[in-house]
Amino acid sequence: MSIELFHVISDAGSAEVRRFVVDHELESAVRFRNLHYPEVQADFARHQGSVPPAVWDGERLFQGAQACIARLSALSDVGRAS
């Protein structure tokens, strides 16, 4: 599964999600996509993105810091004992 995090460097919500990825050691599972770049903006628009940060999981776009963290939490819970 390829997870993409669309983010803005200067945005507080984006920083919160980037920190979550690092704190939960998800760097190998999440591709950071900086919305500063036109090609990243085009991909974001193709997924109907309008609010950073946003996580694309290959099927659905999750927008806003809390929605992103909720989606990424599912990745960090994989393999843990119940």
State where each predicted segment sits:
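Thioredoxin-like thiol-disulfide oxidoreductase module
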Residues: 31-50, 78
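Alpha-helical elements of the RecA-like P-loop NTPase motor core of helicases
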Residues: 15, 42, 70
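N-terminal leader/targeting and pre-domain segments
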Residues: 1-2, 80-82
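Short glycine/proline-enriched coil/turn segments at helix->beta-strand junctions
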Residues: 26-27, 49-50, 58-59
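Secondary-structure boundary motif
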Residues: 23-26, 46, 74
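Local sequence-structure signature of Cys/Sec-based thiol-disulfide redox active-site neighborhoods
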Residues: 1-31, 37
